[in-house]
Amino acid sequence: MGRVKIKVVKRTALELFKRYPDIWTKDFEKNKKLVQALLKKVSKKFRNQIAGYLVRLVKFKEQNKLPIQYLR
């Protein structure tokens, strides 16, 4: 079982997901590089948490299980 993500990670990932909806994939490594490019000064741990949560959001979107408030 995984750990619960902190609010800052979720909020940042959601903002990136809304701002750039078409660049995210289910590939963690690709998302990690994109996060690093978009957020210049971010720690390794924070970058990885955001990239992981973005993978989760992409999977939810593909399954049409993404809550409506995430798409606004």
UniProtKB/Swiss-Prot annotation:
One of its GO terms (molecular function) is structural constituent of ribosome. InterPro entries: Ribosomal_eS17, Ribosomal_eS17_CS, Ribosomal_eS17_sf. Keywords: Ribonucleoprotein, Ribosomal protein. Coiled coil: none annotated. GO terms for cellular component: cytosol; ribonucleoprotein complex; ribosome. One of its GO terms (biological process) is translation. PANTHER family: 40S RIBOSOMAL PROTEIN S17. Belongs to the eukaryotic ribosomal protein eS17 family. This is Small ribosomal subunit protein eS17. It comes from Nanoarchaeum equitans (strain Kin4-M). The lineage of its organism: Archaea, Nanobdellota, Candidatus Nanoarchaeia, Nanoarchaeales, Nanoarchaeaceae.
